[in-house]
Each structure stands twice: as C-alpha cells, then as structure tokens.
Amino acid sequence: MAMKIRCNDQIIVLTGKDKGKRTKIKKILKNGKVILEGVNLVKKHQKPVPAQNQPGGIIEKEAPIDFSNVAIFNEDTGKADRIGFKYENGKKVRFFKSSGKAIAKINKS
C-alpha cells in the first residue's frame, strides 16, 4: 500500500496519549511508522560515551507512532481528512476526499 502522507505534512494524532495534537511529520520509517515533531516523547537513559564526547543522562526523544494512528489535517475544514490521488494535466496529485481540493506540495527543508 502506498503511503499517502509525506514528510512535513500537517497532521493530527487520532489515538494515544497525544490524541488531538497537531504537528508535522519529521520522518517516515519503512516499517509503516512515522516520527512526529514533539509528539510521543519517551525518556531514554543514555550512558556516557567519552570516545564520541557524548554525555550521559536522561534524554527525551520522539518515538515512532504507527501511521494508522495519524491523519492529515485539512485547514479548510479544521478536521482530520482522508487523501486520494487524481491526475491533473498528466501529473498525479494528492487531494482531500472531503473537499476535492488539491494538497499543496511542501518543499523539503
């Protein structure tokens, strides 16, 4: 199945402790999970690594969340939405299923 969401898409979390939070996709993993900015934070107990000049301690990092637990956020309706594909002028374009409006391309930065 093709991933309909992409990096830097504005999304909303559907389930879990961060339900309802709006954020962006930071990274998409190959196992069907995504890493979101500032969501699903876990604390990792890190040992110091003097060879790499890395201090030890408790580090907060973003853990992956399954992509079925997130949905793209439609700013026109203010709700989560589904995505479809259609061809416009010979190019494949993503669009919101509720409104039919094309999703603007986001530059990677």
From Swiss-Prot:
Q: Which terms does the record give in the GO molecular function aspect?
A: rRNA binding; structural constituent of ribosome
Gene3D superfamilies given for it? 2.30.30.30
Signal sequence interval, chain numbering: none
Which Pfam families does the entry mention? ribosomal_L24
SUPFAM superfamilies, A to Z: Translation proteins SH3-like domain
Per its UniProt record, what InterPro entries does this chain match? Rib_uL2_dom2, Ribosomal_uL24, Ribosomal_uL24_KOW, Translation_prot_SH3-like_sf
Top-rank taxon of the source lineage equals Bacteria
Query: What keywords would UniProt list here?
Result: Ribonucleoprotein, Ribosomal protein, RNA-binding, rRNA-binding
One Gene Ontology cellular component term attached to this UniProt record is: ribosome
Q: Which CDD domains is this protein grouped with?
A: KOW_RPL26
What is any one GO biological process for this UniProt entry? translation
Residues passing through the membrane, by range? none
Family the entry assigns: Belongs to the universal ribosomal protein uL24 family.
- PANTHER family of this UniProt entry? MITOCHONDRIAL RIBOSOMAL PROTEIN L24
Subunit structure, as described in the record: Part of the 50S ribosomal subunit.
Q: What does this protein do?
A: One of two assembly initiator proteins, it binds directly to the 5'-end of the 23S rRNA, where it nucleates assembly of the 50S subunit. One of the proteins that surrounds the polypeptide exit tunnel on the outside of the subunit.
Q: What is this protein called?
A: Large ribosomal subunit protein uL24
